[in-house]
């Protein structure tokens, strides 16, 4: 489904070369035991019409444009809808607006001013459908590798890559645990919206550090709560209807976790309450979303009576 030979060539002579050499066989093996819906998603990819991106914008937004007749645009729209639900975006593709559940561009506006990604080799952990990977290239990254074991997200990435085949971005259907230990080959590692799903958050931070070269930079974005260095919320059961949320620290506690994991120059650069305008149901994601997960009488609380989602962005460096 994806030719990794350009990635292997690009990483030759780097600390990631041996890992890259192993990836084609690993991807082939994973495809043999993939998701049951993969054939349906493959059919949607095969239905994508042949179009040429004459204008590509990845900096202010993710937008591809070029000659596209109405009949072709309708076929494109139908093929993309076949890859629903779309969580991260939005994307503008030849006149089709993929209005995703999340306004991920709003998060990127909070993150991007604090980073210089020019010439950086980047790993995006839990990359979803790759929206942020394209934005990283727009910010000048040398190459971006995203990992996420979700096969639908992988196919959504391939839909974009269908029209951007030459750009140095690769999505691998892997989890962080599938990577070799002590890779130490990335200049920048992103972990956004992942930490609170981890039963062992310190181990997650240590694994992220293992992926960075000495002096490399981590960008961590996760759910937080108000409080001091000793404050950590552990939901009794669900949080905003999610069962797989384990630890929501205060910013001060999260900074301590990063220092204990061996990071230096730890700093919080943004804290923002997630609004119902930023995360909501759309035609492209028709299931329940944030408005359904908040107390209808008090949007400062979830339906479980816990603090509503607030997200912090932290930067840290590996010594």
Curated annotation (Swiss-Prot):
Family per record: Belongs to the class I-like SAM-binding methyltransferase superfamily. CmoB family.
HAMAP family assigned: tRNA_carboxymethyltr_CmoB (MF_01590)
Catalytic reaction(s) noted: carboxy-S-adenosyl-L-methionine + 5-hydroxyuridine(34) in tRNA = 5-carboxymethoxyuridine(34) in tRNA + S-adenosyl-L-homocysteine + H(+)
Annotated Gene3D superfamilies: Vaccinia Virus protein VP39
The protein's name in its UniProt record: tRNA U34 carboxymethyltransferase
NCBIfam families in the cross-refs: PRK15068.1, tRNA 5-methoxyuridine(34)/uridine 5-oxyacetic acid(34) synthase CmoB
Listed PANTHER family: METHYLTRANSFERASE, TRNA U34 CARBOXYMETHYLTRANSFERASE
Job of this protein: Catalyzes carboxymethyl transfer from carboxy-S-adenosyl-L-methionine (Cx-SAM) to 5-hydroxyuridine (ho5U) to form 5-carboxymethoxyuridine (cmo5U) at position 34 in tRNAs.
GO MF annotation list: methyltransferase activity; transferase activity, transferring alkyl or aryl (other than methyl) groups
One biological process term in Gene Ontology: tRNA wobble uridine modification
Binding locations of carboxy-S-adenosyl-L-methionine: 88, 102, 107, 126, 176-177, 192, 196, 311
Enzyme Commission number, as recorded: 2.5.1.-
Protein species of origin: Azotobacter vinelandii (strain DJ / ATCC BAA-1303)
InterPro entries the UniProt entry points to: CmoB (IPR010017), Mo5U34_MeTrfas-like (IPR027555), SAM-dependent_MTases_sf (IPR029063)
Keywords: Transferase, tRNA processing
Keyword Acyltransferase in record: no
Record note on quaternary structure: Homotetramer.
